[in-house]
UniProtKB/Swiss-Prot annotation:
Binds to sialic acid-containing receptors on the cell surface, bringing about the attachment of the virus particle to the cell. This attachment induces virion internalization of about two third of the virus particles through clathrin-dependent endocytosis and about one third through a clathrin- and caveolin-independent pathway. Plays a major role in the determination of host range restriction and virulence. Class I viral fusion protein. Binds to sialic acid-containing receptors on the cell surface, bringing about the attachment of the virus particle to the cell. This attachment induces virion internalization either through clathrin-dependent endocytosis or through clathrin- and caveolin-independent pathway. Plays a major role in the determination of host range restriction and virulence. Class I viral fusion protein. Responsible for penetration of the virus into the cell cytoplasm by mediating the fusion of the membrane of the endocytosed virus particle with the endosomal membrane. Disulfide bonds join 29-481, 67-292, 79-91, 112-154, 296-320, 488-492. Keywords: Clathrin- and caveolin-independent endocytosis of virus by host, Clathrin-mediated endocytosis of virus by host, Disulfide bond, Fusion of virus membrane with host endosomal membrane, Fusion of virus membrane with host membrane, Glycoprotein, Hemagglutinin, Host cell membrane, Host membrane, Host-virus interaction, Lipoprotein, Membrane, Palmitate, Signal, Transmembrane, Transmembrane helix, Viral attachment to host cell, Viral envelope protein, Viral penetration into host cytoplasm, Virion, Virus endocytosis by host, Virus entry into host cell. Residues 551-565 are cytoplasmic. A lipid is attached at residues 554, 561, 564 (S-palmitoyl cysteine). The gene is HA. GO terms for cellular component: host cell plasma membrane; membrane; viral envelope; virion membrane. This is Hemagglutinin. The record marks 344-345 as: Cleavage. It comes from Influenza A virus (strain A/Equine/Algiers/1972 H3N8). Homotrimer of disulfide-linked HA1-HA2. It is a single-pass type I membrane protein. Palmitoylated. The keyword Thylakoid does not apply.
Amino acid sequence: MKTTIILILLIHWVHSQIPISDNNTATLCLGHHAVANGTLVKTLTDDQTEVTNATELVQSTSTGKICNNPYRVLDGKNCTLIDAMLGDPHCDVFQYENWDLFVERSSAFSNCYPYDVPDYASLRSIVASSGTLEFMAEGFTWTGVTQNGRSSSCRRGSADSFFSRLNWLTKSESSYSTLNVTMPNNDNFDKLYIWGIHHPSTNNEQTKLYVQASGRVTVSTKRSQQTILPNIGSRPWVRGQSGRISIYWTIVKPGDVLVINSNGNLIAPRGYFKMRAGKSSIMRSDAPIDTCVFECITPNGSIPNDKPFQNVNKITYGKCPKYVKQSTLKLATGMRNVPEKRLRGIFGAIAGFIENGWEGMVDGWYGFRHQNSEGTGQAGDLKSTQAAIDQINGKLNRVIEKTNEKFHQIEKEFSEVEGRIQDLEKYVEDTKIDLWSYNAELLVALENQHTIDLTDAEMNKLFERTRRQLRENAEDMGNGCFKIYHKCDNACIESIRNGTYDHDIYRDEALNNRFQIKSVELKSGYKDWILWISFAISCFLICVVLLGFIMWACQKGNIRCNICI
């Protein structure tokens, strides 16, 4: 009988420790998308922030070929632009050509009388930006001299020849008349005249060609005047010649007049090049030209311009990304990544966004997971997902708009005497690149910080929206989950997700279940404290009883206590 009573009491105690059945409660967790391996990006506060997705902003590779669309790309082949302009015999195919971009090859060479251009870079740039070699011959009158001088160093076919756009004037019989020729510009566009002066290798050659011991060439307009004297002397032999020609150029504005005065050594113009204002350019490159479409061209080849930055080459043509030093800059296009924990306990408990993200979400960035009497489930929240996507969409385009300037960066050249200018130019360019590289990194960090903040904010908005619906019917578990204190089947869970949940319907049931569960939790929670207090009181009582027994025994003489000193 005693055994039966003890067994009944034990069963009753065990039953009292069992909480209310899970059929009468449910758990609802809120979370966000996560991936197993995220991408590290820079923000204002952290250089290594992991996000679910990011887009590379720096174009670091080229196609390896120059695309001939949408621009007219002219392959210079074996000719430089200046040789083609002067009319070098092996460059005759380029006469009257037009281009958006003239491509000079490293294999280009001159094959006529050796020459130099004192202001080579400026002339090359002017002709390149004009985008045409359109030439108009004019009827210059050269009296008292012999025209169309030729050289064995400049052969057209099997015959001696000369630059087709220049007229080499030499003595007529035994004299060289003083020349004074004028040519007005009665048109409404600028005219580019190319002329030169011949530097013989010896005095004998000078008098043999021009009679006078020293000639002179003066070319003037209303705005400028140039007087050049020949420098007679031997130079290194080039194509059988130790003499040289120096090439000069003059631009005549509408209404202005070109005046040429000379008594020898003149390399005269045959006409003018029509100047055009445009955005044509020139580039040195050995990349092959192919049929394809890219709007940005570099010496390495064409590159896409769908990114705001590139570090392929400083020299570009077309609609190109901004050159920066960094090889990579990643723009966050997803939220902060917190990979999901693989182990969730014996019973597969679910956790909310405060603990970790959720992998495998395919129907949204944010969503719900639940456990109820019908099992477990997961669904995305389209409203918060779309709100985040709308703010992130267009972010890349906005960055491109801020940085992708529609212009071409031409290469800059300087002669040796302009070395200090070249050093200054290089310093300025390097400083600009440093500044843009810093600005690019700061801009991306700002955008990344904004992206992470706004995605975190959408998660918090969803959590607050859910909490306001549930009110006292559920309790915040502190990990992004709610403990719902009433029976909540899948239809009930769906009403919470879509915002149609009516907490009044479940309020009484929730309050009743909450009271029962809390009382059990309270009893279970204070059990350890009660045990410790009981143990302490028991020990105290045992000590008191033991002390009393000792005192009683001493009084009766049953115990003797001897103290020796």
